[in-house]
Every structure is written in structure tokens, then in C-alpha cells.
């Protein structure tokens, strides 16, 4: 009997192990353009990887790369070319997303190129092995080599949306060319859209109390490789956008070579930013880091999985790929944006009229639309991805002082007011708040038919926090002030409104009346919406 039990247990464990490994995604042909790209990432980094005209390309994005207009900028585009090219004219071409280990490979009979991201350090690795002596060229391609005017329709990528001020620019990046490495970064000035919004919404008296993630923010990185040397620049054009490429090539042909991109994001001076970047470079241990990263992805897939065949199998495959992309932002300071996350691409491949840069996305970069964000995060309870939820919860916790300051400034009572279409610094999106408002209109309200009185979405995230404790017995005590203050706002505010209309602040049953309210963006002047 004991032997039978042991056998059944081994079968069960073995089945669990096999079922928990997602199948690789394999392509046998090259891509036509960036819209046919494959996700790759880890930690808080995401890449769109594709092979076009025998070149391996990838867009590199990192969470939190917000510019002065609150656009979520990409780091840039990288292009890798091998000579002789093992991917040209071969029937053995294969591009694979190795889901269980979290990396992408491009291979043929004569070569393998691997791209992976260190989950625990902001480092991208490119590794090449070939059967014959091969030279490698790595280009950094940037469309932000000069100041770029934000054109009509392009404002959707930033917090101005349709209300772009005259002369609005996306400022150029800074670069530093060395013989064996290339440094690139974007640095926000002291004055950003944060200051514009604070002034617009009458919050200057409490400005110093407000969270400001944009002032002097620097983000970027450094490209280097043991066998790479600078090889000049060239101009080009991709998907309707001009770019400038800085090129590095192999010092000599070899069978094995590599490149790495180390990233850094912080609010500081350029020298301090460079020092942090250098520390990350010194800490790299490729073998150890790769092992730790693959172990993390292996464990990620063991948490939960869904099985199915036929049409269900197709849906499950899409769910698995979506979960992989969420996993690429597991340890970010910022939640995964509902409108593309880290994996947007050139908009002209969606609509040919939108010949905007690869930085473009609708519904903003630093604008958080809570009623959409919740749809990204609710499923994580069922998949067991509680650690991925932390960035969304911490987003609200960081903004708690701003939300409370806002309530005191406008209405003089306690509680945290979190609006819909809220910026990453805690105030309503300026376009949605309205630049043209009646002088007598309540300054605490968005002058907007869709968003006025829609401030209950935070309660769903409070409920998510409570559910994580129920699902996984997590300690959520650090979020207690957020939950209590969010609830206090409704009690304080709607009692205040009731007393402005009559002598009683509660109804005949002694219950709070929430009026006027809003059920999502659609049902306005709602009575006790739920």
C-alpha cells in the first residue's frame, strides 16, 4: 500500500511540474515590422524584440521613465547585426520566447543570439554564439536626438492630452560617446507639468507637501561590450520617424561575444546618477545573475497555471503571454499601465495617420485611469501573484499625503480624495480637470461630464489589499492608514454636503447618503452608487 501511495504521489508531483511549464512561443519567419514583435523583460524592464531584414531589433522600456510632460518614454531602439549574417536566407530561422526561463532567443543552424533581463538588477544582456568567426554591430537608435515639437494629436502620450500649450516640446536626450561604451539619458528640468497642474488647481499654498516624482528625474543607461568599439553615427528613418544611430562594432571577429545595457533611474544630479550606474555595472555577475533570474521565472510559473485544449487552449495561451508581460514589471516602483504596459510600438502600424514616435500611446504615460487599472490587478489574486500587486498598492500609499492635503485645501475636512484620471503625483489630469472652468465651480471637482464625483475607484484597490490578506495571510498593516483615510473621505464629505442641503447629515435610518455620486464614468448624479 505504501508503494502504491508513493507511486501516485510521484505521478502527481511530476504532473504538476510538467503542467506548470508553459510551452515556448516559436516563430519560424522574420517580422515585417515592430508590430510583429515578441515581449521580453524582467524586474521593471520590457522589450519588444523582432527580426527585420536579418537585423535583430528591440525597443527598450523601463517603468518610471516619465519626462517633463509626463510621457512614459522608451529608452531607445537597439539594432544588432551579425556579419556574416546567420539569419539571412536560411530555412532554419527560429525566434523563441522561452517562457519558463523568461528570455528570447534568435537562432539558425549556425548561430544563437540570446536576449535576457536580470530580474533583480536593471541590466539587459545580449549574448551571441556562432559556428564561424563573426563580427557584431550594435546600434543605439534615438528619435530624441533633438527637441521634438509635440504635434496635434500627439498630446495623448502626455498629461496635456488635447490641451497642448503652444510650443510644447519633448526635450532631447543627452549622450556621452566613449571608445568602448555609450551613455544616454533624459533629465527633466526643475519645472515640469507638475508645477503647471499645481498652479492650475490652486494648490500652491501646500505645494511643498505634495509628492513630485518628476523634478530632476534622470533615466537612461549605458551600452558596453568587451569586444565593442565606437564606429560613428548615421541617420535613418523608421515607421515615419527620423532617428540618429550611434554605432559600435566588434574589434575583431569571434565565435562568442556579448553586449549589455545597464539602466538607472533616480531624482538626482548627473554625477550622482552616473555613480549609481557605475555601481550597478560593478555588481554584475553574469553566471550568478542568470541563474537567479531563471530560477525566479521557474518559480513564477509554478505558482499557478491553467490547462485547456482547442479554443480554450488558444485563450489560455493568450492569458499565459499576458501574465508573462505582467511578470516583466514585477518589481517596479510603478504599476503596469493598462494602456500597453512596457510593450507599445510605433503607432502608425495601428493607424497610418499617426506617424508619431515610438513613445506615443493613448491615455497618457503618467496618468492613472483607475477604472482600467483595476482590471489589470484583480486577476492577480487568483493567479497568486501577490508580489506583483505591491506596486499598485504602493502607488496609492505614496500619494496619501497629497490626497489628504487636497481634501483639506478644498473642503477643510479629513480624508483622502483620489480622483479618476489621476496623475502619478496625485492630482487630477489637467486636461480632464479643465483649463476653462467657471469661476464659481468647486475647485475640488473635475469640470468634466464623465469624471465629476467619480472618486470611489480607490475603494476597489482598498478591497484588493484586504483580499491579499485573506488569500495569502499577508501583513497589510502598512496600508491601514490608506484604507481608513479613503473611507473617512466619504463619511466626512457627504455629511458636509448633506448639511449644506438640510439639517440632517444622515438619512432617516441613520445611514450615510452618497449623493451626488458616479457609477464609473457613465451614470452621473447617482444616489448611493455601488
What do the predicted segments below correspond to?
Residues 312, 366, 447-455, 480:
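Amphipathic, non-membrane alpha-helical segments in soluble helical-bundle scaffolds
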Amino acid at each position: 500500500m505504501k508503494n502504491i501511495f508513493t507511486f501516485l504521489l510521484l505521478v502527481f508531483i511530476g504532473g504538476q511540474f510538467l503542467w506548470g511549464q508553459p510551452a515556448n512561443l516559436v516563430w519560424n519567419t522574420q517580422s515585417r515590422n515592430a508590430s510583429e514583435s515578441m515581449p521580453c523583460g524582467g524586474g521593471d524592464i520590457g522589450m519588444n524584440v523582432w527580426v527585420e531584414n536579418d537585423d535583430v531589433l528591440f525597443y527598450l522600456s523601463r517603468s518610471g521613465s516619465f519626462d517633463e510632460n509626463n510621457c512614459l518614454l522608451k529608452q531607445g531602439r537597439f539594432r544588432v547585426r551579425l556579419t556574416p549574417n546567420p539569419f539571412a536566407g536560411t530555412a532554419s530561422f527560429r525566434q523563441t520566447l522561452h517562457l519558463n526561463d523568461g528570455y528570447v532567443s534568435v537562432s539558425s543552424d549556425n548561430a544563437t543570439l540570446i536576449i535576457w533581463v536580470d530580474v533583480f538588477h536593471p541590466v539587459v544582456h545580449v549574448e551571441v554564439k556562432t559556428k564561424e568567426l563573426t563580427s557584431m554591430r550594435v546600434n543605439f537608435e534615438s528619435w530624441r536626438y533633438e527637441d521634438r515639437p509635440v504635434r496635434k494629436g500627439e498630446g495623448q502620450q502626455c498629461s496635456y492630452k488635447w490641451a497642448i500649450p503652444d510650443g510644447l516640446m519633448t526635450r532631447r536626450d543627452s549622450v556621452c560617446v566613449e571608445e568602448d561604451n555609450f551613455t544616454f539619458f533624459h533629465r527633466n528640468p526643475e519645472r515640469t507639468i507638475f508645477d503647471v497642474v499645481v498652479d492650475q488647481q490652486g494648490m500652491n499654498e501646500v505645494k511643498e507637501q505634495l509628492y513630485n516624482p518628476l523634478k530632476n528625474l534622470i533615466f537612461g543607461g549605458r551600452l558596453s561590450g568587451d569586444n565593442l568599439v565606437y564606429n560613428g553615427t548615421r541617420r535613418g528613418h523608421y515607421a515615419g520617424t527620423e532617428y540618429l544611430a550611434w554605432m559600435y562594432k566588434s574589434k575583431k571577429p569571434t565565435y562568442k561575444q556579448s553586449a549589455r545595457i545597464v539602466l538607472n533611474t533616480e531624482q538626482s544630479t548627473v554625477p550622482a546618477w552616473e555613480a549609481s550606474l557605475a555601481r550597478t555595472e560593478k555588481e554584475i555577475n553574469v553566471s550568478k545573475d542568470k541563474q537567479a533570474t531563471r530560477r525566479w521565472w521557474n518559480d513564477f510559473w509554478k505558482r499557478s497555471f491553467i490547462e485547456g485544449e482547442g479554443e480554450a487552449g488558444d485563450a489560455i495561451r493568450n492569458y499565459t503571454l499576458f501574465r508573462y508581460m505582467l511578470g516583466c514589471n514585477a518589481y517596479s516602483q510603478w504599476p503596469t499601465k493598462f494602456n500597453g504596459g512596457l510593450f507599445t510600438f510605433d503607432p502608425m502600424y495601428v493607424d497610418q495617420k499617426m506617424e508619431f514616435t515610438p513613445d506615443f500611446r493613448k491615455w497618457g504615460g503618467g496618468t492613472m485611469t483607475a477604472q482600467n487599472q483595476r482590471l489589470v490587478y484583480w486577476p492577480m489574486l487568483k493567479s497568486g501573484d501577490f508580489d506583483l500587486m505591491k506596486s499598485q498598492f504602493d502607488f496609492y500609499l505614496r500619494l496619501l499625503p497629497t490626497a489628504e492635503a487636497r481634501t483639506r485645501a478644498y473642503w477643510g475636512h479629513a480624508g483622502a480624495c483620489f480622483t479618476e484620471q489621476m496623475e502619478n503625483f496625485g492630482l487630477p489630469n489637467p486636461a480632464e480637470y479643465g483649463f476653462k472652468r467657471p469661476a464659481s465651480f468647486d475647485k475640488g471637482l473635475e469640470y468634466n461630464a464623465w469624471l465629476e464625483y467619480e472618486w470611489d475607484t480607490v475603494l476597489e484597490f482598498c478591497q484588493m489589499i484586504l483580499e491579499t490578506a485573506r488569500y495569502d495571510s499577508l501583513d497589510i498593516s502598512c496600508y491601514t492608514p490608506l484604507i481608513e483615510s479613503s473611507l473617512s473621505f466619504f463619511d466626512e464629505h457627504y455629511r458636509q454636503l448633506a448639511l449644506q442641503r438640510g439639517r440632517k447629515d444622515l438619512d432617516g435610518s441613520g445611514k450615510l447618503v452618497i449623493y451626488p455620486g458616479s457609477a464609473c464614468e457613465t451614470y452621473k448624479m447617482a444616489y448611493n452608487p455601488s
